[in-house]
Amino acid sequence: MSRMTVLSPSAGSQSACSLGLILVNPRRPLRSLSILFGLWKALIFLVIVICPGLGYDTSTSLLLYPTRDLSDVDPLHFPLSLRFVRWDSIYFVHAAEHGYVFEQEWAFGYGYTRLLALLASVLVLYRLSVNIFGGDTAKQKTLCFLSAALHIISPAGAFLSAPYGEALFSLLNISGLYLYSSSVLDAATNHRLSRDLKLLAAAVLISAATAVRSNGILGGVLFAYDALLQLPQILSRGLSLAVVSRLAVIVLGGCVIALGMAVPQYIAFNAFCMTSNAPRPWCGWTIPSIYRFVQEKYWNVGFLRYWVVPNIPLFLLAMPILALLLRSAFWAWRLPSVTSKFSENGANGALTKAMWLLPRLAIIQALLAVLAFTSYHVQIINRLSSGYPLWYWYLAAELISDFKNSQSTNKCISISAVAVQAIMIYGLIHAVLFGSFLPPA
């Protein structure tokens, strides 16, 4: 008589639990985050490639067949790689292949087409989180891990897998913030040379992020904040060598960030305004800016220009992320009560670290939300938000708090958990829309 092995329910749950520990284990963050990243990206990739046909908009096919009648193109022979070339990525790919040929292509970050990088911002975000909140206690490790995991399922969705600027911007901006936070920690231990070198390195990365996406210029708030911190010392003690040298490093860092915006504009000015042809209208502006001109002319971007009735659905689509950005910015101002949750047994390391940086990041994130609401195509905030870590920390802290409360109150519904589920569902739905070249962009 043959023997049949039957797994008990408890054995099945143990196997599932073991699998869960492999996938989500804050004690092994690098491995766990890499596995989660691979699984989520594979799912997004699968959803996009199974979308049938050329898509609602057939502009992508012009990259491959610029002179052919699209009715002759067999969708089955359409390269899978071009399924990721949708919306603005058509401009990125064309500029990467041929350079900046058309005026409107200058609306898309000059830095991106000159440097294509793999997305590593998830792991950098984990290290940044450790710098801010510490990584000594189980609660701190969980917060840092969850924050990085949330970055994987960012509402940017398919844009982080396609030839768009969001992935590289996230990497550069978060890496810049990591070096900036390391500079702050060195300042606390009086390592001045290391502090200044890391501050300048952070400025270089944020400047590169600005060359990829113009909203990176908001990183200059960090340096403006640092400069203002020097004023009380100057007023109370007067100028000293230490204060002057510190202020010089801060101002130099701010100028480096400004170069990320100014250099592409200078290159465009030479290309369009210093020729024998009739100069473009923007060449005569007090501060010539091809970026501002093409945004206004070709995309109708400007203060309250997007506030028209047909765009109401797009505002509704953006509202959850806008609310999350503003709510988490306000959360960061409640610094003592927030960081004390992660300072156990009288330890104040997390409080000291977060006190230096969270309010500054709150200013940046709040400015981004206000600009998106008043002056951008508002729906792009769903992807712009991917490069700003504050809301990841807020949502991770809420998940931890809700889980703790559910254990004591037997409450099953968690608003933070529902928010995470909504982000994941949105990411999958957006992958379908993206693969079919359907809005929103």
Curated annotation (Swiss-Prot):
Keywords tagged on the record: Endoplasmic reticulum, Glycosyltransferase, GPI-anchor biosynthesis, Membrane, Transferase, Transmembrane, Transmembrane helix
GO-annotated biological processes: GPI anchor biosynthetic process
EC number: 2.4.1.-
Record pathway: Glycolipid biosynthesis; glycosylphosphatidylinositol-anchor biosynthesis
Entry's transmembrane regions: 4-24, 35-55, 115-135, 143-163, 165-185, 199-223, 249-269, 306-326, 361-381, 418-438
Protein name: GPI mannosyltransferase 2
Family annotation (Pfam families): Mannosyl_trans2 (PF04188)
GO molecular function: alpha-1,6-mannosyltransferase activity; glycolipid mannosyltransferase activity; mannosyltransferase activity
Family annotation (InterPro entries): PIG-V/Gpi18
Similarity section: Belongs to the PIGV family.
Topology within the bilayer: Multi-pass membrane protein
Function: Mannosyltransferase involved in glycosylphosphatidylinositol-anchor biosynthesis. Transfers the second mannose to the glycosylphosphatidylinositol during GPI precursor assembly.
Example of a GO cellular component annotation carried by this entry: endoplasmic reticulum membrane
